[in-house]
Amino acid sequence: MPLAVTPDSKEPRQPDSTSVKDNRPFFVVVAVLAVLGIAVSAVSLQRHYAKSQTKFCDVAVQFNCDIVNRSEFSSFFGIPVAGIGVAGYAIILALATIYRLRPWVPNVLLAGALAGLVFALYLTYVEGFVLDTWCILCLGSLAIIASISTLGGVINSRTR
């Protein structure tokens, strides 16, 4: 840590811990949201591979997870989008747990969360304007990644 000079003394000293912003509460919330994102994405992944339709989140024609999860847009280069979600949230969870060990974590967390948000916004556009139906699980995942992106921005601004 850089040395600081106090106004009443010309002696250099280590900065006290209160001058360093603690982002731990933000990373804890990010970790909890990432676990929630893993759960939502895992349920969506299960629905992607399920043989039968369920009424789990098929509440109306306009809200039908099975239509979204079985559409041509439910895979990206042959990988289920929900599987990408599970992997992405797992990476975010890992970053949220190692944040004190690596100084680059806030930047990578923000970049990853923003990439996930852009992808989720694209998929939400497809739901609403191409498929003309909404997936409640997908909208939940969008809310989670938007929250993580916001927190990533807060964390990043506090570490500068």
Where are these predicted regions, by residue range?
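Membrane-interfacial helix-loop segments of redox and metal-homeostasis proteins
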Residues: 2-160
